[in-house]
Amino acid sequence: AFAGVLADADIKAALAGCAAAESFNYKTFFKACGLAGKFFAIIDQDHSGFIEEDELKLFLQTFSAGARALSDAETKDVDGDGMIGVDEFVALVKA
């Protein structure tokens, strides 16, 4: 999904920064990739206007099939409704 959008080196650096369990940090990841503005639409695989926790758990695998799935703790949304809207996502990556 990211072919031609991100440089392979940027993807590798971003994935390396969160290889260990419980180490994923949205701000660091998006900063390493350099394209926070385009990610919401890409992660929202079903184009519902929200990122569901299941979509977010498989987020790293969008970059590389061998990447780990994110844990429940790493994908918990702020308001607890199980979905991350655009405003919540922007706040999350800018936090």
From Swiss-Prot:
Ca(2+) 1 binds at D44, D46, S48, F50, E52, E55. It holds the Pfam family EF-hand_7. Keywords: Acetylation, Allergen, Calcium, Metal-binding, Muscle protein, Repeat. Ca(2+) 2 binds at D77, D79, D81, M83, E88. One of its GO terms (molecular function) is calcium ion binding. One of its GO terms (cellular component) is cytoplasm. InterPro entries: EF-hand-dom_pair, EF_Hand_1_Ca_BS, EF_hand_dom, Parvalbumin. Residues 39-66, 77-95 form the EF-hand domain. The modification N-acetylalanine is found at A1. Belongs to the parvalbumin family. In muscle, parvalbumin is thought to be involved in relaxation after contraction. It binds two calcium ions. Is regarded as an important allergen. On the 2D-gel the determined pI of this protein is: 3.79, its MW is: 11.32 kDa. This is Parvalbumin beta 3. It comes from Merluccius paradoxus.
